[in-house]
């Protein structure tokens, strides 16, 4: 069970995804560290404002899970979140995608029905959402552009394997190779290979897995000990399930990378085969020229075999001899 630190929380928030498993896993971890409720909410609020628009709603889902599931253990989170929720709702309503308004309203209705917060505070949150919905035209246009970009990205990510492949610049090959190697190396420390955690899970007492054994508990002290053990088991299993889910996504991503890498290498191979054929033809032409040149050289007369036509003749007169008066 990892200890609390702001840097650890920042890392976990950066890895938070919009899945129930991811939200519940982090929620359990936060509730376990509820004595740090103040710093937790402060980091949550800061990271919410820094998060990409498509992830902001997930931060509020996390806050909801923490607030509702921590109430029986104490009011720490309910109180701490209350101090930042007005700004958080206003910020998310203003900065997140247009489709987030209905989920936010549904969340507030649930809080009102379950009396998570008082009616006056709920109304304040609703008003903060309404007041934030009038961005300047330029900002609205930029947000729309961002939204389209995110949708395009989502459409690409929804396919486990690309149905079509667009040729890549061969110069991207080394970068893709490095990414593939890193992805393979990261999987060496995957959750499925964590023997230590698997041993901890295997060593959990039978009481945390078998409801029928609860009848054997006869005193409050034993019940409290078991409650603590069950809480720790829930956190251990939730964290491990979260890691396994992340590993599964990593392996899917690796499979996509392998498909892309294979396609890239096929294109590079095809290009190199064309180059090889081109240079084979050049070699053949140069070899033919060499052969013809050798044959031509062999057909030329050997000047060293010609007779010495100047032998026995007087040397030609010099310029001085020609103009001499003697």
UniProtKB/Swiss-Prot annotation:
Annotated region described as Disordered, given as residue ranges = 128-148
Question: Which CDD domains does the record associate with it?
Answer: CID_RPRD1B
Q: SUPFAM superfamilies given for it?
A: ENTH/VHS domain
**GO biological process terms held by the UniProt record:** positive regulation of cell population proliferation; positive regulation of transcription by RNA polymerase II; regulation of cell cycle process; RNA polymerase II promoter clearance
Q: What is its main location?
A: nucleus
Gene Ontology cellular component list = nucleoplasm; nucleus; transcription preinitiation complex
Tell me the keywords, alphabetical order.
Answer: Acetylation, Nucleus, Phosphoprotein, Transcription, Transcription regulation
Q: List residues, modification Phosphoserine.
A: 132, 134, 166, 299
Biased-composition ranges, Basic and acidic residues, are: 128-144
InterPro entries registered for this protein in UniProt: CID_dom (IPR006569), ENTH_VHS (IPR008942), RPRD1A/B_C (IPR032337), RPRD1B_CID (IPR047882)
Single Gene Ontology MF annotation: RNA polymerase II C-terminal domain binding
Which tissues carry this protein?
Widely expressed in the adult with highest levels in liver, colon, prostate and uterus and lowest levels in heart and kidney. Not detected in rectum.
Could you tell me which residues carry N-acetylserine?
A: 2
Q: Where is the CID domain?
A: 2-133
Which pairs are disulfide-linked? none
Q: Residues where Phosphotyrosine occurs?
A: 161
Q: Which family does it belong to?
A: Belongs to the UPF0400 (RTT103) family.
Protein name (record): Regulation of nuclear pre-mRNA domain-containing protein 1B
Origin species: Mus musculus
Gene of this entry: Rprd1b
